[in-house]
């Protein structure tokens, strides 16, 4: 009597399993393990979770005296939650730094409930007063309104908006004075709707402190001349009146081309301030305080449309030594419509970053990233 076919099939299957096991015992499991770890990281990324475990990070040290800061309105709740989730996942779930939220109106119960559930640290909610969120009392209202009309007709970006001008003035000279931030040494500005595409395997606040840096950025680009035609002249007047504030090893070569110094024209390069990590004592310094007062009495936030980004950038470039400014090149960051993505192989080979380095803003003609690197190396 012959052997049943089912037994033959079973023996063949058993032989295949044993052969596979013997082969994999030599070199298979190591390869399979690598594939599994990679797939596990990719799946975590798809879920929006961090890819790194605690052992992948530098040893954790005590937190710095710092806060994450967001200026927003109640209607920004969805975008605010996107930003909070991104920062918490990529960084803060390990550190639990507090958040400070500011608004020119009272925060709604819905906003407070939703955001406080998502943050991993304490949350503080602040309503701004009329001095912080307003226009100077001595301003020429007719001139301001004419400027708004003219910029609206000329289609200057945000030229139509009074609230945008008020926001830029607040971010230039008032946020760091607010009582809610008065006891902090460092802050990290987070705007609604931004996303971080790389895990952050260290504490950037501590990095600034350990390396004696006062200001950190991730994207730099040129600004719109139509928004700030007189800002550089007003700034130069301030430096000529207060030469003691000009840092010896400043970054004039970043903001002025061809090593022309203060005699040259502003090249419009600035740090995009929707992301910045900074020592608040820089903004509280006599140099910055006097500089903002000088700008404010010229009313350029309203007669023109000065932004807080060029104001911060000019101040940092002039009042700080270049070694005190840090380029967070290893951060992955998106703010509509641009993003920065690290270009080193390791960040992508380890799945630390989930972004396309070929599309980073640094390669575009209006980026000032190369200009900054030239300034550092000069």
Curated annotation (Swiss-Prot):
<keyword id="KW-0256">Endoplasmic reticulum</keyword>
<feature type="topological domain" description="Cytoplasmic">
    <location>
        <begin position="1"/>
        <end position="6"/>
    </location>
</feature>
<keyword id="KW-0808">Transferase</keyword>
<dbReference type="GO" id="GO:0006493">
    <property type="term" value="P:protein O-linked glycosylation"/>
</dbReference>
<dbReference type="InterPro" id="IPR029044">
    <property type="entry name" value="Nucleotide-diphossugar_trans"/>
</dbReference>
<keyword id="KW-1133">Transmembrane helix</keyword>
<dbReference type="InterPro" id="IPR002685">
    <property type="entry name" value="Glyco_trans_15"/>
</dbReference>
<comment type="function">
    <text>Probable mannosyltransferase involved in O-glycosylation of cell wall and secreted proteins.</text>
</comment>
<dbReference type="GO" id="GO:0000026">
    <property type="term" value="F:alpha-1,2-mannosyltransferase activity"/>
</dbReference>
<dbReference type="Pfam" id="PF01793">
    <property type="entry name" value="Glyco_transf_15"/>
</dbReference>
<feature type="transmembrane region" description="Helical; Signal-anchor for type II membrane protein">
    <location>
        <begin position="7"/>
        <end position="24"/>
    </location>
</feature>
<dbReference type="GO" id="GO:0000032">
    <property type="term" value="P:cell wall mannoprotein biosynthetic process"/>
</dbReference>
<protein>
    <recommendedName>
        <fullName>O-glycoside alpha-1,2-mannosyltransferase homolog 3</fullName>
        <ecNumber>2.4.1.-</ecNumber>
    </recommendedName>
</protein>
<feature type="active site" description="Nucleophile">
    <location>
        <position position="276"/>
    </location>
</feature>
<keyword id="KW-0735">Signal-anchor</keyword>
<keyword id="KW-0812">Transmembrane</keyword>
<dbReference type="GO" id="GO:0005783">
    <property type="term" value="C:endoplasmic reticulum"/>
</dbReference>
<feature type="topological domain" description="Lumenal">
    <location>
        <begin position="25"/>
        <end position="378"/>
    </location>
</feature>
<dbReference type="GO" id="GO:0000139">
    <property type="term" value="C:Golgi membrane"/>
</dbReference>
<keyword id="KW-0472">Membrane</keyword>
<dbReference type="GO" id="GO:0005789">
    <property type="term" value="C:endoplasmic reticulum membrane"/>
</dbReference>
<keyword id="KW-0333">Golgi apparatus</keyword>
<dbReference type="GO" id="GO:0005794">
    <property type="term" value="C:Golgi apparatus"/>
</dbReference>
<keyword id="KW-0328">Glycosyltransferase</keyword>
<dbReference type="GO" id="GO:0006487">
    <property type="term" value="P:protein N-linked glycosylation"/>
</dbReference>
<comment type="similarity">
    <text>Belongs to the glycosyltransferase 15 family.</text>
</comment>
């Amino acid at each position: 009597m012959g052997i049943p076919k089912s037994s033959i099939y079973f023996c063949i299957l058993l032989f295949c399993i044993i052969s596979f096991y013997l082969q994999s015992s030599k070199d298979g499991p190591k390869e399979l393990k690598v594939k599994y770890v990679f797939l596990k990281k990719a799946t975590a990324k798809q879920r929006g979770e961090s890819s790194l475990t605690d052992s992948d990070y530098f040893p954790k040290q005590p937190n710095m005296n710092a806060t994450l800061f967001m200026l927003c309105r109640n209607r920004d709740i969805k975008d605010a939650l996107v930003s909070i989730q991104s920062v918490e996942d990529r960084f803060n779930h390990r550190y639990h730094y507090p958040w400070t939220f500011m608004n020119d109106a009272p925060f709604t119960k819905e906003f407070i409930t939703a955001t406080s559930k998502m943050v991993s640290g304490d949350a503080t909610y602040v309503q701004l007063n009329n001095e912080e969120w307003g226009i100077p009392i001595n301003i020429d209202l007719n001139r301001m309104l004419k400027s708004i009309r003219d910029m609206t007709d000329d289609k200057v970006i945000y030229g139509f908006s009074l609230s945008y001008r008020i926001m830029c003035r607040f971010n230039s000279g008032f946020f760091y004075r607010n009582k809610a931030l008065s006891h902090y040494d460092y802050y990290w500005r987070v705007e609604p709707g931004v996303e971080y595409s790389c895990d952050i395997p260290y504490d950037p606040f501590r990095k600034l402190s350990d390396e004696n840096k006062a200001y950190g950025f991730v994207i730099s680009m040129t600004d719109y001349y139509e928004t700030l035609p007189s800002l550089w002249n007003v700034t130069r007047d301030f430096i000529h009146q207060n030469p003691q504030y000009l840092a010896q090893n400043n970054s004039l070569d970043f903001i002025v081309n061809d090593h022309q110094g203060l005699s040259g024209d502003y090249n419009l390069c600035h740090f995009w301030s929707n992301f910045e990590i900074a020592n608040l004592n820089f903004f509280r310094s006599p140099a910055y305080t006097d500089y903002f007062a000088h700008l404010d009495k010229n009313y350029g936030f309203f007669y023109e449309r000065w932004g807080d980004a060029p104001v911060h950038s000019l101040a940092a470039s002039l009042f700080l030594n270049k070694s005190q400014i840090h380029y967070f090149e290893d951060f992955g960051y998106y703010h509509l419509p641009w993003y920065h993505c690290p270009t080193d192989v390791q960040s992508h080979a380890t799945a630390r970053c989930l972004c396309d380095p070929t599309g980073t803003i640094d390669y575009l003609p209006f980026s000032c990233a190369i200009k900054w690197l030239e300034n550092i190396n000069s």
